[in-house]
Swiss-Prot record:
This is Ornithine carbamoyltransferase. Keywords: Amino-acid biosynthesis, Arginine biosynthesis, Cytoplasm, Transferase. Transmembrane segments: none annotated. It is found in: Cytoplasm. Belongs to the aspartate/ornithine carbamoyltransferase superfamily. OTCase family. It comes from Staphylococcus haemolyticus (strain JCSC1435). PANTHER family: ORNITHINE CARBAMOYLTRANSFERASE, ORNITHINE CARBAMOYLTRANSFERASE, MITOCHONDRIAL.
Length: 332
């Protein structure tokens, strides 16, 4: 058993393969216990602060339900719910909350902010998403892949298609390197990850028997994949000119039925962190259709709704994996 007590969870790069595997195995155990109705509460009497500078469905619900299942109490501080960054620095907020709470989750913009919270609060801090990283998401992604494919992690061929610089792509590449996977990042050259992160991940992968390939060649990149993963192309709030340029760059990289077939693997699955623009059933989806004439963006609705799509199992697993992180770092 790995001792992660009082550790913060800021990036997967802070953890060894054994530690990440321990969290994934614990996630499986906690999920089984919940389904069997025999879950033991390890967080009784704990108070947890959830700081959200960005709105959220899955991350917030996962942290809240996981905490409640384990007997903890939570306080939600939304985008307008605290003074952090406005009247009070992250350093000061950390020291205030650290005196009242046993653990802190942060979902926001800056990786530096979550690092400051961890440095000055004196309690475990968990990264629920920053512009650079999304480590809790990757635990759910990997757990889902193992459940469906029934393969050990190091045998999974994992492929991300789309914007190679975004936080999910960064986090997946880190996680795959640590777990010794074959990881392909398929994206336009203009959207390649930073050399610094890529080189570091390649070094880690080599030590763990994994391999990382970055390519703009879709056929080469998806061949042999067990998992095809994508994420939204543009973040909300980015100007129209960014949307236009990004859509033009990434339209060839939309995950379609043809792309899934190019894997040559009939058992290949589709993953997405959600939300997804796969139809026009949302306000944003309708705006995309009106402005750009598209009824789907990063993934075809045909794939999203197919039997190969495991996105809702993946979403549920956010709760089980986040619960594992909290229990491992804060549990009695």
């Amino acid at each position: 058993m790995q001792n992660l007590r009082n550790r913060s969870f800021l990036t997967l790069l802070d953890f060894s393969q054994k530690e990440v595997e321990f969290l994934l195995n614990l996630s499986e155990d906690l999920k089984r216990a919940k389904y069997a109705g025999i879950e033991q509460q390890k967080l009784k009497g704990k108070n947890i602060a959830l700081i959200f500078e960005k709105d959220s469905t899955r991350t917030r619900c996962a942290f809240e339900t996981a905490a409640y299942d384990q007997g903890a109490h939570v306080t939600y501080l939304g985008p307008t719910g605290s003074q952090m960054g406005k009247k009070e620095s992250a350093k000061d907020t950390a020291r205030v909350l650290g005196g009242m709470y046993d653990g802190i989750e942060y979902r926001g913009f800056s990786q530096r902010t979550v690092e400051e919270l961890a440095k000055y609060s004196g309690v475990p801090v968990w990264n629920g998403l920053t512009d650079e990283d999304h480590p809790t998401q990757v635990l759910a992604d990997f757990l889902t892949a193992k459940e469906v494919l029934k393969k050990p992690y190091h045998e999974i061929n994992f492929t991300y298609v789309g914007d190679g610089r975004n936080n999910v792509a960064n986090a997946l590449m880190q996680g795959a390197a640590i777990m010794g996977m074959t990881f392909h990042l398929v994206c336009p050259k203009e959207l390649n990850p930073t050399d610094e992160l890529l080189n570091r991940c390649k070094e880690i992968a080599a030590k763990n028997g994994g391999e990382i390939l970055v390519t703009d060649d879709i056929d080469e990149g998806v061949k042999g994949s067990d998992v095809i993963y994508t994420d939204v192309w543009v973040s909300m709030g980015e100007p129209d000119e960014v949307w236009e340029k990004r859509i033009k760059l990434l339209e060839p990289y939309r995950v379609t039925k043809e792309m899934m077939e190019k894997t040559g693997n009939p058992r290949a699955i589709f993953e997405h962190c959600l939300p997804s623009f796969h139809d026009t059933e949302t306000k944003i989806g309708k705006e995309i259709q009106e402005k750009y004439g598209l009824t789907e963006m990063e993934v075809a609705d045909e794939v999203f709704e197919s039997e190969q799509s495991v996105v809702f199992q993946e979403a549920e697993n956010r709760a089980h994996t986040i619960k594992a992180v909290m229990v491992a770092t804060l549990g009695e």
